[in-house]
């Protein structure tokens, strides 16, 4: 999936966000709030893991698409985007995963 594809998905989400919740699934997600959207991301993540463990490539791809879509909705809901995620990934490029994790603030 290219950055252009994700940008297109984000533009569709932004447009559908303006629609009536009765007419648009995307709008209904925003209408129900961040907690509901986050729950949907969690559900799709679990379904993706289950499909992967079942070694069902087609289901894995389908569930991964659902996960990416719902993640895009969550990012939009929180005022973020995949571009910001890509910037963070670029920032981490060349940094050891262990070193990056160790440098994070302790919570």
Curated annotation (Swiss-Prot):
Q: What one GO molecular function would you report for this record?
A: phosphoribosyl-ATP diphosphatase activity
Q: Which UniProt keywords apply?
A: Amino-acid biosynthesis, ATP-binding, Cytoplasm, Histidine biosynthesis, Hydrolase, Nucleotide-binding
| Domain of life of the organism encoding this protein | Bacteria
Q: Which InterPro entries match?
A: HisE, PRib-ATP_PPHydrolase-like
A Pfam family matched in the record: PRA-PH
One of the protein's GO biological processes: L-histidine biosynthetic process
Location in the cell? Cytoplasm
Q: Which reaction does it catalyse?
A: 1-(5-phospho-beta-D-ribosyl)-ATP + H2O = 1-(5-phospho-beta-D-ribosyl)-5'-AMP + diphosphate + H(+)
The record's EC number reads 3.6.1.31
Q: Does the keyword Methyltransferase apply?
A: no
Query: What's in the GO CC field?
Result: cytoplasm
EC category name: hydrolase
Q: In which pathway does it act?
A: Amino-acid biosynthesis; L-histidine biosynthesis; L-histidine from 5-phospho-alpha-D-ribose 1-diphosphate: step 2/9
Task: Please give the PANTHER family that the UniProt record associates with this protein.
Answer: HISTIDINE BIOSYNTHESIS BIFUNCTIONAL PROTEIN, HISTIDINE BIOSYNTHESIS BIFUNCTIONAL PROTEIN HISIE
- What family is this? Belongs to the PRA-PH family.
Q: What is this protein called?
A: Phosphoribosyl-ATP pyrophosphatase
Q: Which organism is it from?
A: Zymomonas mobilis subsp. mobilis (strain ATCC 31821 / ZM4 / CP4)
**From which lineage does this chain's organism come?**
Bacteria, Pseudomonadati, Pseudomonadota, Alphaproteobacteria, Sphingomonadales
